[in-house]
């Protein structure tokens, strides 16, 4: 196998806020901590195409924002497919949003950066309302 870069691993563990928990067994970690371990593993792999399936779902609000910011900074120049049920998360983080309705795929307009969008930005709230209307099946 390939050699593990322990420096990079320690930095990523620190970045996801688990430095004090690195010697614990998985059963000793909370759901949110396990979620951050999975995120750290993805960050360590450093692949050009990344699938994130509900990566922030078990996190508290502050940690969620911190991890969203971390992911956005670490995945610059990579293709990321983010699966989420959170319209705010989609609008804050994504350049393009697809809505799945059964077997139908509906693409919304492309969004422009910078990313992640500021949670206090009025544009974020307008885009989120527009996305929610589309999810409900209302005309845009």
Description of each model-found segment:
Residues 4-21:
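Conserved ABC ATPase "signature" region
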Residues 44-48:
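A short, proline-enriched helix->beta-strand linker immediately N-terminal to the Walker B motif
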Residues 25-29, 33:
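Conserved ABC ATPase signature
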Residues 64-76:
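Helical segment within the ABC ATPase nucleotide-binding domain
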Residues 50-54:
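Catalytic Walker B motif of ABC-type/P-loop ATPase nucleotide-binding domains
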């Amino acid at each position: 196998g390939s050699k593990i870069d322990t420096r990079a691993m320690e930095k990523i563990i620190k970045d996801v806020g688990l430095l004090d928990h690195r010697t614990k067994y998985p059963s000793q970690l909370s759901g949110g901590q396990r979620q951050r371990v999975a995120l750290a593993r993805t960050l360590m792999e450093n692949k050009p195409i990344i699938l994130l399936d509900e990566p922030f779902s078990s996190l508290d609000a502050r940690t969620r924002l911190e991890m969203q910011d971390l992911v956005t900074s670490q995945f610059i120049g990579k293709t990321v497919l983010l699966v989420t049920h959170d319209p705010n998360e989609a609008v804050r983080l994504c350049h393009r949003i697809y809505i799945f309705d059964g077997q139908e795929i509906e693409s919304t307009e492309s969004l422009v950066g910078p990313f992640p969008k500021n949670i206090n930005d009025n544009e974020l709230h307008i885009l989120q309302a527009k996305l929610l209307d589309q999810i409900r099946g209302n005309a845009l």
